[in-house]
Amino acid sequence: MERIKELRDLMSQSRTREILTKTTVDHMAIIKKYTSGRQEKNPALRMKWMMAMKYPITADKRIMEMIPERNEQGQTLWSKTNDAGSDRVMVSPLAVTWWNRNGPTTSTVHYPKVYKTYFEKVERMKHGTFGPVHFRNQVKIRRRVDINPGHADLSAKEAQDVIMEVVFPNEVGARILTSESQLTITKEKKEKLQDCKIAPLMVAYMLERELVRKTRFLPVAGGTSSVYIEVLHLTQGTCWEQMYTPGGEVRNDDIDQSLIIAARNIVRRATVSADPLASLLEMCHSTQIGGIRMVDILRQNPTEEQAVDICKAAMGLRISSSFSFGGFTFKRISGSSVKREEEVLTGNLQTLKIRVHEGYEEFTMVGRRATAILRKATRRLIQLIVSGRDEQSIAEAIIVAMVFSQEDCMIKAVRGDLNFVNRANQRLNPMHQLLRHFQKDAKVLFQNWGIEPIDNVMGMIGILPDMTPSTEMSLRGIRVSKMGVDEYSSTERVVVSIDRFLRVRDQRGNVLLSPEEVSETQGTEKLTITYSSSMMWEINGPESVLINTYQWIIRNWETVKIQWSQDPTMLYNKMEFEPFQSLVPKAARGQYSGFVRTLFQQMRDVLGTFDTVQIIKLLPFAAAPPEQSRMQFSSLTVNVRGSGMRILIRGNSPVFNYNKATKRLTVLGKDAGALTEDPDEGTAGVESAVLRGFLILGKENKRYGPALSINELRNLAKGEKANVLIGQGDVVLVMKRKRDSSILTDSQTATKRIRMAIN
């Protein structure tokens, strides 16, 4: 009451009223600003003001039991006065120091596990190399980049379920962990975070960083993988760049990189097969990248690259609506067109049928090393503003834009015939014919395009037909800009269709992608790519084909064995034997095949002459179209390691070595697997079937000299006798028949007599 009375007295004096109304603080807006709401309006000032007080901190009453009233220097750590408006204690900043030095300690074992991404970032920075700083104009373009190194690729929903299961396992709510990656991560995190004392909310937040890809649309000049983006603020400014080599790689970047390589290899291989789409799907489904199924990665990974998008389209996934031409991503930003077939004549008077886009359109063109804005009308380039890292990159963009414009002077600039073909030896479509032609040599195109004088516009210069810059003249309609063109930022995905030749179209029928757009660049994948499909065996060379073929036979031996005896033709036509044919000398393929098929037929005709190892060894040779000949072979040649190597019909060789004791097969010294059944099950083995034209007289007779091998028998005259080594090392006496007889009767009697002779 005293206070109020005092205030009333003050207010009655005119001077007080004048001070309060005339000075600026009475602005109601200002008073409101600083007094309304719980949000601190000037945190820095508030902090300074608070810290100037003796006890700026409030704490729970329990602190009085945990901290002494005074420290060793005798300074007071907390005040006995209660905090106004609450039952908390006023505490000095010195109490924090005391607590840090003398307070209870807790286990730090979980910190690196929870704050894994931070710890890993520090390691990468420690081992990274920072190079010199260069001052130069930076052409940055906004790209969608991954800002979060070291993450898995779960969707937000999948990650949410994993986090709930790990951090709040007892909370109610339906959680369905279906994908393999979800289950693996959940199991691993539960084990690692047992008895973790860190606040659950913090754990949840850190887990999210580890599980979900976070992307931002940022201006970048240079590397776009996440280990570069995390140091973007250190490596590029407006007018400077600092060289940097990351001190470590992260799995998400490695997956992105390996996925692109796998997709390119698969699309290239599918293009040359009889049914590209079916082959592509078969390969995507049977390939693993770093131990994860490629189809799972494709479903989760947002990487946009031509080959990757073709694979996604084949799987029925949505992809970006932009289209690709000449290695540039085109996005229409305004205008529209209708398509019409038109016949045009090249400078060489060759007729081309092109699909002309009629109408005014504007596009952004984004490539790895150059970007541009293109404005065009029907078969006319109106304006192209291009920016790039160097002369070469700018020239590439200009060629693509000139071809895309479909201008007559471009078509008339063609010298010579257009007959480019793709990997499957099919002619390319006319637009890609033109593109390839000018990518090889664009001199005539640039000379014929025409030049024009230019106005002085800030940030733009001209470019001459020889690709040198100029401030006076430029190629008609074309300017070079210092500023880059941003990548298309939208993450919108559209439904597309794909035909059997892997051409991807949007719902209006526009071609977005085709195999011609897939880069030929070869790279080495960071993660192991395992192609289980036989179509990809060739990728690692002849040795890989050889080993993979035999591994496949051994893995599938149960079914192969049945087919071998019941339906050999179907077996010989299996695509798994296709790659092997490239190893067999062309001239010998048909003869080898005929010989092996005859041999197999003899085995089938004669019971008990089944030799597993020999069938496995010779089977791939039977896949070629057979030639009927009476040729006999003791060995078959395959071209590996740069020369012909022999596979012996009987017995082991460096190429094909079967160890009876371990039952394991080695091909070129590499393990190709184990035979689960006993290969000796066929008693006498295949040899009896090869004894065509011989009579078996009985057991070995030393009078006739040492045992010959089956191949040496060929030299015997009719009626001559000899000892011969057959089967598993048994020796019998034979006589060459005086007349030719059927294979069948010979083989049947041979089998019976061998049994008698041995027993």
From Swiss-Prot:
Q: How does it assemble?
A: Influenza RNA polymerase is composed of three subunits: PB1, PB2 and PA. Interacts (via N-terminus) with PB1 (via C-terminus). Interacts with nucleoprotein NP (via N-terminus).
Q: What more is known?
A: SC35 was derived from A/Seal/Massachussetts/1/80 (H7N7) by serial passages in chicken embryo cells, thereby acquiring a multibasic cleavage site in its hemagglutinin (HA) and becoming 100% lethal for chickens. SC35 was then passaged 11 times in mouse lung, yielding the mouse-adapted variant SC35M.
> Which locations, inside or outside the cell, does it occupy?
Virion; Host nucleus
Alphabetized UniProt keyword annotations: Cap snatching, Eukaryotic host gene expression shutoff by virus, Eukaryotic host transcription shutoff by virus, Host gene expression shutoff by virus, Host nucleus, Host-virus interaction, Inhibition of host RNA polymerase II by virus, mRNA capping, mRNA processing, Viral transcription, Virion
Show which residues constitute the signal peptide.
none
Its function? Plays an essential role in transcription initiation and cap-stealing mechanism, in which cellular capped pre-mRNAs are used to generate primers for viral transcription. Recognizes and binds the 7-methylguanosine-containing cap of the target pre-RNA which is subsequently cleaved after 10-13 nucleotides by the viral protein PA. Plays a role in the initiation of the viral genome replication and modulates the activity of the ribonucleoprotein (RNP) complex.
Instruction: Tell me which domain of life the UniProt entry assigns to the organism this sequence originates from.
Output: Viruses
Q: Does the keyword Transcription apply?
A: no
- Keyword Cytoplasm assigned to the entry: answer is no
HAMAP family tied to this protein: INV_PB2
Motif Nuclear localization signal located where?
A: 736-739
What is this protein identified as? Polymerase basic protein 2
This entry's Gene Ontology molecular function terms read: RNA binding; RNA-directed RNA polymerase activity
What GO biological process terms does the UniProt entry carry, in alphabetical order? 7-methylguanosine mRNA capping; cap snatching; DNA-templated transcription; symbiont-mediated suppression of host gene expression; symbiont-mediated suppression of host mRNA transcription via inhibition of RNA polymerase II activity; viral RNA genome replication
Residues the record marks as site: Avian adaptation: E627
Family statement drawn from the similarity comment of this UniProt entry: Belongs to the influenza viruses PB2 family.
One cellular component term (GO) for this entry is:
host cell nucleus
Record the organism: Influenza A virus (strain A/Seal/Massachusetts/1/1980 H7N7)
- The gene from which this protein is expressed is PB2
